[in-house]
UniProtKB/Swiss-Prot annotation:
It is found in: Cytoplasm. Can catalyze the hydrolysis of ATP in the presence of single-stranded DNA, the ATP-dependent uptake of single-stranded DNA by duplex DNA, and the ATP-dependent hybridization of homologous single-stranded DNAs. It interacts with LexA causing its activation and leading to its autocatalytic cleavage. One of its GO terms (biological process) is DNA recombination. InterPro entries: AAA+_ATPase, DNA_recomb/repair_RecA, DNA_recomb/repair_RecA_CS, P-loop_NTPase, RecA-like_C, RecA-like_N, RecA_ATP-bd, RecA_C_sf. The gene is recA. GO terms for molecular function: ATP binding; ATP hydrolysis activity; ATP-dependent DNA damage sensor activity; damaged DNA binding; single-stranded DNA binding. This is Protein RecA. Residues 316-376 are annotated as: Disordered. Residues 331-350 have a biased composition (Basic and acidic residues). GO terms for cellular component: cytosol. Coiled coil: none annotated. Keywords: ATP-binding, Cytoplasm, DNA damage, DNA recombination, DNA repair, DNA-binding, Nucleotide-binding, SOS response. Residues 366-376 have a biased composition (Acidic residues). It comes from the Bacteria.
Length: 376
């Protein structure tokens, strides 16, 4: 009896593979990897907060937050990292607001960056689908979900009601994109804005536009918010920014990366390197002085950053960088000649939010409650 069932199952598996191709069905243990294949976010602190060392390949990432909080900066750093590894990045600029000079300052090779500024939401998502289907890009950024305006709304009159149009558009697009992204190993970053729900007396009144589909399909959701200003004397030169991992399917969520975003320069990568190195005693801090291997490298954080940033101290910078990554258990940085487009599949490291001591089931995450546009 048992042998007959096994023979029937084997025959069914062979037929499925013949009809739909090898790999269309498999036993779970055949595809288990101990490490998720990732691409660095461009921020060490964010790599650590994500738990796996970067953005998981083949997945959807949502980055949301208030205006001018650093959402585009986070996405551009990812594009720069992909290009450093020899990959290709594409940017769907639905807001028509991408600053090429700023992108270049963050390390993006603007000559190689694929850019599209679509007229309608449908056009932007069709372009995104074609790019991902090609299997030739490694990162797709859509900026932003709120700016993906349906064609019917653009062609209609001011004041016309278009309930659920954008939610329906996003739901349909994500159903198509999710499988293709997984197959090609492409990372898709959706930048999103926030809105306020009218009439909410208790809980968080904030929500994100575009319906609920993106929240479900996202493997990682990042909330980006400014927390303080950074001043040089009386001049404001940047913002201290908190990036909270509000959803994570590949590692425990709810971790926070606190970074400095400097105007015109992006995330202060050397600054966060020093902070992490001090936490692990790789760099010693005594009073205002910072020292590495017994040698003083600067009085005050700004001077220590300048010391590490100087070309003559590149060796020390690289040593500290490697030590920090090893200490935090996120492995070695991949060689620049490795193709990030290699489609190495991995199994989700399932995480239960109830295992996290900071988890609060009553907390209101932006977008948890339905609005008129959230019917899909």
């Amino acid at each position: 009896m048992a042998s007959g069932r096994k023979a029937a199952l084997d025959a069914a598996l062979k037929k499925i593979e013949k009809d739909f191709g090898k790999g269309s069905i498999m036993r779970l243990g055949e595809n288990v990897h101990t490490q998720v294949d990732v691409i660095s976010t461009g921020s060490l602190k964010l790599d650590i907060a994500l738990g796996v060392g970067g953005y998981p390949k083949g997945r959807i990432i949502e980055v949301f937050g208030p205006e001018s909080s650093g959402k585009t900066t986070v996405a551009l750093h990812a594009a720069a990292e992909v290009q450093k590894q020899g990959g290709t990045a594409a940017y769907i600029d639905a807001e028509n607001s991408l600053d090429a000079k700023y992108a270049q300052a963050l390390g993006v090779n603007v000559d190689d960056l694929l850019l599209s500024q679509p007229d309608t939401g449908e056009q932007g998502l069709e372009i995104a689908d074609d790019l991902v289907n090609s299997g030739a890009i490694d990162l797709l950024v859509i900026d932003s979900v709120a700016a993906l305006v349906p064609r019917a709304e653009i062609e209609g009159e001011m004041g016309d009601s278009h309930v659920g149009l954008q939610a329906r558009l996003m739901s349909q697009a994500l159903r198509k994109l999710a499988g293709t992204l997984n197959r090609t190993g492409t990372i898709a970053i959706f930048i999103n804005q926030i809105r306020e729900k009218i009439g909410i007396m208790f809980g968080n009144p904030e929500t994100t536009p575009g319906g609920r589909a993106l929240k479900f399909y996202s493997t990682v959701r990042l909330e980006v918010r400014r927390s303080a200003q950074i001043k040089d004397g009386t001049n404001i030169v940047g913002n201290n920014t908190k990036i909270k991992v509000v959803k994570n399917k590949v590692a425990p969520p709810f971790k926070v990366a606190e970074v400095d975003i400097m105007y015109g320069k992006g995330i202060s990568q050397t600054g966060e390197l020093i902070d992490l190195a001090v936490d692990k005693d790789i760099i010693n801090k005594s009073g205002a002085w910072y020292a590495y291997q017994g040698e003083k490298i600067g009085q005050g954080r700004v001077n220590a950053i300048s010391w590490l940033d100087s070309p003559e101290h590149k060796k020390e910078h690289d040593e500290i960088f490697t030590s920090v990554r090893d200490q935090y258990g996120i492995g070695e940085k991949k060689d620049s000649d490795e193709d990030p487009g290699d489609n190495k599949k991995s199994k989700d490291s399932a995480s239960d939010p109830f295992d996290d001591p900071n988890y609060n089931p009553k907390s209101s995450d932006p977008g948890d409650d339905l609005s008129d546009d959230d019917i899909y």
